[in-house]
Structures are given as structure tokens and as C-alpha cells.
């Protein structure tokens, strides 16, 4: 059993994960982060995307967060997100449809067009698809 740190992944609706992990990998606002026990305390914004955790014993689990914050304390990693879900529970068809709708909104700018909202929706849909792809790659191993 390797050295571990406690990790909580919490959405506005519920706690998604709570347990000991050897590593947390997440998409921070300044790039990807790899958090291991003993990491320097940190508070950063998260981009929409996958959060991978390596549990004790090497088992990996993947989650999707729509953004939020990651906080690292000496013995604790906390991820707070508006919305989070296990990657295995994601619907690829819905993610593809959301991506198409966002691309269509960007292409057909109307009078009350909100570019930032459409771009944000496109980024989130693309991140959902990346998370699904990571999950597939994990299952192939």
C-alpha cells in the first residue's frame, strides 16, 4: 500500500467520491495538475474536463467536472464543482448532440447571440467527449 491522501469530489447536488487516493489528476485553469501526497497547499480553478484518481492499490477511476475549484491541504484534496459525474455514467450521444448544438449556435449568430455562452457550452461538450474517450482508453488496457 502506497502513501495516500484523502480526496473528496463534491458537486452542488451530492458527494461523488470520498476516499484515500495515491494521485489526483485534473484540468486546472493553468494546465493539468498531478496531485500526490505531500503536494504544496494550493487553490486553483478547474476547467471542464476529466478528473482521474488513482486509488490505493492502483485502481483508477475517472470523473467529469464542469469546472469548479481544487484545494490541496497537507492531508486532503477537495474538488468542488457545480456538476460532477462518474465517467462511466456519461451519455456519449447526448455529449455529441450538445457539441453539435453549440457549434450550430456559434455558426448562426443571431441578434441576441451570446458568444461567450455558446463557446462555454462547446468547451464543456468537447471536455465531456474527451472524458468518455479517456474512459474507453482505460478500459482497453
UniProtKB/Swiss-Prot annotation:
Q: Which GO MF term does the entry hold, naming one?
A: proton-transporting ATP synthase activity, rotational mechanism
InterPro entries annotated for this entry? ATP_F1_dsu/esu_C_sf (IPR036794), ATP_synth_F1_dsu/esu (IPR001469), ATP_synth_F1_dsu/esu_N (IPR020546), ATP_synth_F1_esu_C (IPR020547), ATPsynth_dsu/esu_N (IPR036771)
Instruction: List the disulfide bonds in this chain.
Output: none
Chaperone as UniProt keyword? no
According to its record, how does it sit in the membrane?
Answer: Peripheral membrane protein
The alphabetical list of record keywords is:
ATP synthesis, Cell inner membrane, Cell membrane, CF(1), Hydrogen ion transport, Ion transport, Membrane, Transport
Q: What is its main location?
A: membrane
Q: Where in the cell is it found?
A: Cell inner membrane
> Where does this protein have coiled-coil stretches?
none
GO CC, any one term: proton-transporting ATP synthase complex
The similarity annotation says: Belongs to the ATPase epsilon chain family.
Q: What does this protein do?
A: Produces ATP from ADP in the presence of a proton gradient across the membrane.
| Self-association state and partner proteins as the record states | F-type ATPases have 2 components, CF(1) - the catalytic core - and CF(0) - the membrane proton channel. CF(1) has five subunits: alpha(3), beta(3), gamma(1), delta(1), epsilon(1). CF(0) has three main subunits: a, b and c.
Protein name as catalogued: ATP synthase epsilon chain
Question: What organism is the protein native to?
Answer: Hahella chejuensis (strain KCTC 2396)
Q: Provide the gene name from the record.
A: atpC
